[in-house]
Amino acid sequence: MILRGMEDSKSAQKRFEAAVKVIRSLPEDGSYDLSDDMLVLFYSYYKQATEGPCNTLKPNSWDPIGKAKWEAWKDLGNMSKDQAMTEYVQEIQLIIETLPVTDRMAELLDALDPFYEIVEDDDDDDDEGVSKAAPLFTGSTNADKDAERDEEVESESKEGNLDDYMELVEKQKDLSSTTGEKGSLLVFNRSEENSISSLTDGTHSSLNTVDDEEELVYDGSDDEMDSDSMDKPATPEKGSGVRSVRLADGSVVGANMQHGGNREPQCGSQDGKPQGLISPVPHPPTLGTVRNDRISACSGRERGCQGDGGQRGETADRMDKQAINTQITTILSELEDNMQDVLRRLTTLEQLTASQAEISPSKTWHSDKPKKRLSWWPLNSSPFTAVLTVLWPFAVHWLVQFYLQRRRRR
């Protein structure tokens, strides 16, 4: 038991050392880049496996990376070194499939030989020379084989259904071409339609585009035959009731009154054969006249049916246009009245302004009376100005002297 425990610890240490070498050998700009959380987790397991429980001081707050590493290491508590090594190897096993195979990876795979093997990829060896490590599962190979076998059987059944469907499509096209030459309507087989719908329901989603194209072909053929049926007469059904009118010359006009549908009444022959609007009679001139009359009568009924709705629509449109024209006329008349009122007010204002200008006297800033001038005074200035000019120096001198005397007395 002791020897087995030592062997287990040695194998765990060997795997741990190989895993550490793989992590350290990863390139910084490689195809797979470890996240920060994964790096912190590997760091905590590595420190726990190499140094034991965390007993160091907590880093400063300005070192968030060191703080995260310390907290992850501290959270492991008293985990043993062997358990930390095992956890480290288990974490790297989760991402080993995404790592490139190198020499360090080969050492790790040798240590994990009971669980993994190297699978060489021939296509990648020519370009990169690097292969991936894939896990071996004993039960997965049988499941893959069963899945592949089921896919092959399903694909074969789908191909067979598609072939049957294409044959039905070709038959339908041939049938439509032959019936079109004979001038009769295309009768769609309901059983074939059901079989085609069942086949399309069972096919794979990748065949949807083919089914859509074939459905468009059927829709196009149906539309063509519907348009032909409007121009050509339909075959009269048994028991539908055929009214015949015998003319004076012996010709017969048949009107097929069909019930239970949305189609217009069709003209048919008396003998029930699809031979046009009128059955052939031995009088060609009269036949042509009757055919033209019948066609004109049918077209007249259609125009009459369409004309009722058209006249109603035209009457409603005409009434709407008349109402709009009436509103526009009313608005224009009101606008004209408002403009005339504004012009009338402007004319009155101009007249009032002109009358006020005529009544008010004009103001002048100049005095009407001229200044009186002394005849005996020779100067242009007044005598008072001249006396003041002569006496003001004496007055100033006297004031200065008086001020000085008062100052001396003090």
From Swiss-Prot:
**Domain (ACB): residue spans on this chain:** 12-101
A Pfam family annotated for this chain is ACBP
Annotated GO molecular function terms are: fatty-acyl-CoA binding
Q: Which InterPro entries match?
A: Acyl-CoA-binding_prot_CS (IPR022408), Acyl-CoA-binding_protein (IPR000582), Acyl-CoA-binding_sf (IPR035984), FERM/acyl-CoA-bd_prot_sf (IPR014352)
Q: Which residues does the record give as an acyl-CoA binding sites?
A: 23-32, 43-47, 69, 88
**Region: Disordered, residue numbers:** 119-165, 221-242, 254-320
Q: Which stretches are tagged as biased composition: Acidic residues?
A: 119-128
Tell whether Transmembrane helix is among the UniProt keywords. Answer: yes
Subcellular location per the Swiss-Prot or TrEMBL entry: Membrane
Regions crossing the membrane: 382-404
Q: Which UniProt keywords apply?
A: Coiled coil, Lipid-binding, Membrane, Transmembrane, Transmembrane helix, Transport
Taxonomically, which superkingdom? Eukaryota
Q: List the disulfide bonds.
A: none
- State any GO BP term from the record: fatty acid metabolic process
Q: Coiled coil where?
A: 326-355
What are the record's GO terms for cellular component? cytoplasm; membrane; peroxisome
Q: What does this protein do?
A: Binds medium- and long-chain acyl-CoA esters.
Q: What is this protein called?
A: Acyl-CoA-binding domain-containing protein 5-B
Question: What gene does the UniProt entry assign to this protein?
Answer: acbd5b
